Design a protein with these regions (language model features):
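Active-site-adjacent structural elements that line small-molecule/cofactor binding pockets in enzymes
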Residues: 1-147
Length: 147
């Protein structure tokens, strides 16, 4: 998990990698913040919990995950929105199609072998649904890859 320095961390890892018998090539696993919902709009609403958490991390006001807030991003100062966006640069937030495209783009951009997803959704049932949508997106991506 190196959200703001993801590409630099990947370059450093690959440049300093030393092959071994067990791992002749680098194996890249990256952490990805993910919020998935049936629609992009609902995912953005649910992501407001993550935005609140990130802002708390950045300002030293750490708390337990808070419930989502309607139009949370609109209430923020431009520099707060920018800081949250920077922190979550590798995040994938959206409905099924957006998530599928976002995961595919992230793998293409990074060459990741594995994605470790974290879904900070306040409601546990909706968190599970978020991960189920991500699993469906992954399955669709795998089905599209030629054997």
């Amino acid at each position: 998990f190196a959200p703001r320095l993801l590409h630099q961390a990947i370059d450093l890892y690959r440049n300093l990698y030393r092959p071994s018998a067990a791992w002749p090539k680098p194996y890249l696993a990256i952490g990805v913040p993910l919020i998935a919902a049936p629609t992009d709009e609902e995912a953005e609403f649910l992501a407001s919990s993550t935005y609140q958490r990130v802002l708390g991390i950045l300002t030293g006001d750490r708390r337990l995950l808070l419930p989502p807030v309607e139009n949370y991003a609109a209430r923020l100062q431009p520099q707060e929105r920018a800081a949250i966006g920077d922190f979550l640069a590798a995040a994938v937030i959206g409905g099924p199609e957006t998530v599928q495209a976002g995961l595919a783009d992230l793998v293409r951009e990074t060459g990741a072998n594995e994605l470790m997803l974290v879904s900070d959704v306040y409601d546990p049932a909706l968190r599970l649904r978020s991960l189920e949508i991500a699993a469906q997106a992954h399955a669709a991506l795998q089905a599209a890859v030629p054997a």
